[in-house]
Amino acid sequence: MAMAQQAGSRPRVVVVGGGFAGLETAKALAKAPIDLTLIDRQNHHCFQPLLYQVATAALSPADVAWPIRSILRGQANARVAMAEVEAVDLDSREVIASERRFPYDVLVVATGATHAYFGHDDWAPFAPGLKRIEDATDIRRRILMAFERAELAEDPAVRQALTTFVIVG
């Protein structure tokens, strides 16, 4: 692998994304003789498998989020930048994020996935995704508001409709 770093310096690895793949990549390189920068737009890692419990009020958002800096605290070769990646300049080998430039010799793009509406974007207001803490708290708010409205409804059919939920996926 050809490295563009200056003579005598360590290879620069930039990991974009602080989800499972990005964090595991960073941790796997803990003992490597490199300078690693992990960039994410959030300063926390969200444990997505438990987001449904945040949405249903069984857990608080703090129970499924851990500061990325804390996770990588003991890793001497790593630093964390909270920034939103705007572009990758392939010619200069730099990631451009929040008006800063992060030079790299090796780039790992681990930005995760998003939900899809399969050509039906009009479903989005009625079928929110569940990938972020904000998604979970929005779903929680919608559920609690539906119960509040159902409690005030006099018509049993309206009450039934307000307390009927469909989960897809």
Task: Go through each PLM region and give its residues.
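Beta1-alpha1 glycine-rich phosphate/pyrophosphate-binding loop at the start
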Residues: 2-82, 86, 160, 165-166
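FAD-binding core/adjacent interface of flavoenzyme oxidoreductases
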Residues: 1-12, 78-166
